[in-house]
Design a protein with these regions (language model features):
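Conserved cofactor-binding/catalytic machinery of classical short-chain dehydrogenase/reductase
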Residues: 11, 19-22, 33, 65, ...
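NAD(P)H-binding glycine-rich loop region in Rossmannoid oxidoreductase-like domains
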Residues: 1-15
Length: 226
């Protein structure tokens, strides 16, 4: 919970940084390969291009990103046999997610929904991440940091329109700026992640977000009832 981390920073650091260090140390002591899940929020979001695994994060612009970056560093320090996976704009059947939120709002009393149109990222399904993780797990020689987000990019406004279109909703959506939608934690303007490591190790590419989302909605047609 990005906003909860901003309002409860001590807890965020204990879980994301100290907790990661403890898990990494335990894995190293027991000879266990560690798979750690991280986030696009370790980057500041001010780049004009997608971030690669070879870009050095600055720690992000919110407590969540800063504490997750500290957790990444702890994993690298305490457990050399590791894979760090960065994901972003994640959705799945279990929720909560942006998809669930939009569909719930569409079933409410709002005539018009304002959705942020100046934040860019890669909408990514949990199913796509799991498939990619499986490919990493069967390659025991792999170590390092991997970006696992779907190909293609969108803004939250773009994503919202596609959600309503595929769900058969007639909800009116209008774009707004981040300044108009204030949250406890700032969000990066650029959350796009490039997958150079997948290509480097000849691993299957991630699917395009639109195709993946279409398949997700077909398989989870009742998600709007969640």
């Amino acid at each position: 919970d990005v906003d909860k981390c901003e309002t409860c920073p001590d807890m965020a650091w204990k879980i994301n940084a100290v907790g990661s260090a403890n898990v990494a140390s335990a894995c190293q002591r027991n000879g266990i390969r560690l798979i750690a899940i991280s986030t696009d929020y370790v980057f500041s979001g001010d780049s004009e291009r997608p971030y690669t695994e070879f870009d050095t994060p600055t720690g992000g612009i919110n407590v969540y990103g800063q504490s997750k970056w500290a957790g990444e560093q702890a994993v690298r320090t305490h457990c050399p046999n590791h894979i760090i996976v960065r994901i972003s704009w994640l959705y799945g059947p279990g929720g909560p997610s942006f998809v669930h939120t939009m569909l719930k709002l569409a079933d409410g009393s709002r005539n018009v929904l304002k959705v942020v149109n100046d934040q860019h990222g890669n909408p990514t399904s949990t199913f796509a991440v799991v498939r990619a993780l499986r490919e990493l797990l069967i390659r025991p020689e792999l170590v390092g940091t991997f970006h696992l987000t779907c190909e293609g990019e969108a803004t939250w406004y773009d994503f919202a329109r596609r959600i309503f279109e595929l769900a058969g909703k007639s909800q009116k959506v209008v774009p707004c700026s981040s300044a108009e939608y204030v949250t406890p934690a700032r969000r990066p303007a650029n959350s796009r992640l490039e997958k150079k490591m997948l290509a480097l190790y000849n691993l299957p590419p991630m699917p395009h977000w639109e195709r993946e989302f279409e398949e997700f909605m077909v398989k989870n047609e009742n998600i709007q009832l969640c």
